[in-house]
């Protein structure tokens, strides 16, 4: 069938891939706080975004400034935010040149036997077109 030849290009660790420390932590947190949560890529995305928000708040606390401006300054100062392999490390900054998005991708095959119905074929990689792009 056609679905056996379909690929999806996205980002992120495969649900259940505990070789990624971030996924191992996500699964522990799901077991502890939301044991009925079904495997879901959108849940994983939200969890990852919460980790970024946590990094912003932690930086603002270390700067002793939880004001709106303090949170924004904390965001602009974040570099190499490690998400434990859920996504590649993220960089933020105060200028477009510093806010270069991740260029990594993962190719997945449709696989209904997997928790989120996709199977990682490639691991994180950056294609030549993405490497050459300028922002």
State where each predicted segment sits:
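General N-terminal targeting signals
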Residues: 23-25, 83, 88, 135
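Extracellular/periplasmic periplasmic-binding protein-like sensory domains
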Residues: 1-47, 61, 124
């Amino acid at each position: 069938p056609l679905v056996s030849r379909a690929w999806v290009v996205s980002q992120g660790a495969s649900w259940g891939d505990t070789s990624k420390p971030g996924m191992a932590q996500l699964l522990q947190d799901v077991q502890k706080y939301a044991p009925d949560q079904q495997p879901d890529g959108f849940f994983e995305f939200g969890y990852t975004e919460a980790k970024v928000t946590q990094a912003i708040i932690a930086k603002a606390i270390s700067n002793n400034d939880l004001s709106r401006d303090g949170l924004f300054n904390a965001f602009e100062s974040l570099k190499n935010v490690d998400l434990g392999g859920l996504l590649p490390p993220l960089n933020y900054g105060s200028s477009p040149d510093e806010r270069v998005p991740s260029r990594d991708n993962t190719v997945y095959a449709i696989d209904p036997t997997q928790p989120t119905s996709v199977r990682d074929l490639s691991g994180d990689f950056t294609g030549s077109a993405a490497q050459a792009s300028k922002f």
